[in-house]
């Protein structure tokens, strides 16, 4: 199996605090991996290390068999697209189409080829009809889909989304996650997705969930395998996905008759 990302014996410290020590992680090409953990667990730092925005003290990072070094960092980055948390910080163009074109201009795509590439990328994420709109007129979810289109136009092998839905309302969050599912289905093994999140419901959509805390890999497996470890998740500051947490508490329902009012009162305690 081809490895999209391979991390061996990674060590990284910040302000004399060790964030990663002998950290190892392999991600197969075409896999959707959710990196989850509470704020400060190290997951966003890991993304910056993979992109070469931070430099590890020791260890190796390979992206599709290319070792990340000072000499190769720009070529490695060309294989990776990144979508960040705040959609407003990612727009540089006057219109949606201009924004998608910006990345293409940076890699010196011929101007005659740009319109087709822009239309293709916007169509994939369902934003083609908005291509002449000004970014400030879009919703948060629409802005993040445009950010995805800007990345897709560059044809990366890997897309990393760093808390890309954290600032969105439920509708915006849902549209972005639906778009990711569509990308997974459309591109298959040709596209590797890495979603960094603390939202467990989002993580259930991935092929694989990796739980990180204090720079250590705590759990690693399918969503079913990871979310069966309720105690370990709670010990690391995480909750189960809502449906799983509800199912757990329903199993603890008092074994006695309750009328409708009592049942409602008991259910209301589950949200505290």
UniProtKB/Swiss-Prot annotation:
CDD domains hit by this protein: ABC_cobalt_CbiO_domain1 (cd03225)
Function: ATP-binding (A) component of a common energy-coupling factor (ECF) ABC-transporter complex. Unlike classic ABC transporters this ECF transporter provides the energy necessary to transport a number of different substrates including 5-formyltetrahydrofolate, pantothenate and riboflavin. Expression of the complex plus FolT in E.coli allows 5-formyltetrahydrofolate uptake; 5-formyltetrahydrofolate is not taken up in the absence of FolT or the EcfA1A2T complex.
EC number, UniProt record: 7.-.-.-
UniProt keyword terms in alphabetical order: ATP-binding, Cell membrane, Membrane, Nucleotide-binding, Translocase, Transport
PROSITE patterns in the cross-refs: ABC_TRANSPORTER_1, ABC_TRANSPORTER_2, CBIO
Active site per the UniProt annotation: 163 (proton acceptor)
Cellular component GO terms, alphabetical: ATP-binding cassette (ABC) transporter complex
Keyword Translocase: yes
One GO MF term: ATP binding
Quaternary structure and partners: Forms a stable energy-coupling factor (ECF) transporter complex probably composed of 2 membrane-embedded substrate-binding proteins (S component), 2 ATP-binding proteins (A component) and 2 transmembrane proteins (T component). This complex interacts with a number of substrate-specific components, including FolT, PanT and RibU for 5-formyltetrahydrofolate, pantothenate and riboflavin respectively.
Enzyme class of the recorded protein, top EC level: translocase
Compartment list: Cell membrane
Residue positions binding ATP: 37-44
Protein name stated in the entry: Energy-coupling factor transporter ATP-binding protein EcfA1
Domain ABC transporter: 5-239
Principal location listed in the UniProt entry: membrane
Family: Belongs to the ABC transporter superfamily. Energy-coupling factor EcfA family.
Topological type in the membrane: Peripheral membrane protein
Gene3D superfamilies reported in the protein's UniProt record: P-loop containing nucleotide triphosphate hydrolases
């Amino acid at each position: 199996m081809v490895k999209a990302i391979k991390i061996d014996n990674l060590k990284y410290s910040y302000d004399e605090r060790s964030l990663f020590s002998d950290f190892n992680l392999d991600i197969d090409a075409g896999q959707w991996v959710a990196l989850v953990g509470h704020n400060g667990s190290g997951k966003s730092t890991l993304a910056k290390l993979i992109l070469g925005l931070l430099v590890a003290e020791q260890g190796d990072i390979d992206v599709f068999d290319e070792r990340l070094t000072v000499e190769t960092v720009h070529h490695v980055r060309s294989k990776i697209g990144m979508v960040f948390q705040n959609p407003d910080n990612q727009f540089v163009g006057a219109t949606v189409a201009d924004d998608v074109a910006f990345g293409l201009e940076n890699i010196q795509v011929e101007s005659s080829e740009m319109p087709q590439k822009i239309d293709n990328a916007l169509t994939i994420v369902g934003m083609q009809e908005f291509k002449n709109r000004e970014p400030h007129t879009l919703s948060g979810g629409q802005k993040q889909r445009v950010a995805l289109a800007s990345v897709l136009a560059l044809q990366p092998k890997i897309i990393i989304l760093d808390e890309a839905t954290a600032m969105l309302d439920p509708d915006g969050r849902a549209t972005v996650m639906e778009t990711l599912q569509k990308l997974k289905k459309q591109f298959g093994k040709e596209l590797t997705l890495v979603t960094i999140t603390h939202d467990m419901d989002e993580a259930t959509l991935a092929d694989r969930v990796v739980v990180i805390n204090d720079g250590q890999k705590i759990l690693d497996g399918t969503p079913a395998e990871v979310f069966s470890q309720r105690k370990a998740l709670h010990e690391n500051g995480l909750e189960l996905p809502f449906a799983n947490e509800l199912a757990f508490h329903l199993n603890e329902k008092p074994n006695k008759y309750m009328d409708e009012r009592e049942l409602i009162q008991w259910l209301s305690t589950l949200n505290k």
